């Protein structure tokens, strides 16, 4: 009998990258609301080739499991030469510190979106852009990556 799993990208990345038992990410209602506002503002300022809140899903078959993975990429930048998944992160801590401490989680999440987009559009290579925005300062930092399907 085939076992079926339905997972969000968030659930998958949390499970795969879980280490220890302390989660040092900062979550509170005020910070989350401000993050939502910053995401929407940032997305509204992007060019017409920027697809905000892009819904993705893919089915994977592993052993006797059917896994449906789904999630919503913050943005997809559609270019002729390279599609780029934009993952936006807002924080109240130093951007370099935040990136260094959370890079594996952020890249893992973006890689899932990139793979699903590549499968949907039959692409061999997809770019990833991690966009970090400070919630109280006017600071932004961008990290770029390129991945190919293997």
What label would you give each PLM region?
Residues 60-150:
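Mg2+/Mn2+-dependent nuclease catalytic core
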Residues 1-82, 108:
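Metal-dependent nuclease catalytic cores that hydrolyze phosphodiester bonds in DNA/RNA
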């Amino acid at each position: 009998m085939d076992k079926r799993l339905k997972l969000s990208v968030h659930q998958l990345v949390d499970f795969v990258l879980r280490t220890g038992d302390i989660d040092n990410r900062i979550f509170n209602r005020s910070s989350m609301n401000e993050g939502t506002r910053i995401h929407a503002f940032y997305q509204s300022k992007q060019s017409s080739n920027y697809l905000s809140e892009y819904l993705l899903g893919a089915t994977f078959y592993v052993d006797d499991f059917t896994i449906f993975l789904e999630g919503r990429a913050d943005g997809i930048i559609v270019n002729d030469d390279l599609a780029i998944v934009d993952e936006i992160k807002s924080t109240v801590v130093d951007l370099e510190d935040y990136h260094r401490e959370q890079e594996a989680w952020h890249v893992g999440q973006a890689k899932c979106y990139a793979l699903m987009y590549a499968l949907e559009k039959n692409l061999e290579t997809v770019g990833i852009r991690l966009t970090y925005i400070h919630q109280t300062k006017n600071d932004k930092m961008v990290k770029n990556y390129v991945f190919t399907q293997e």
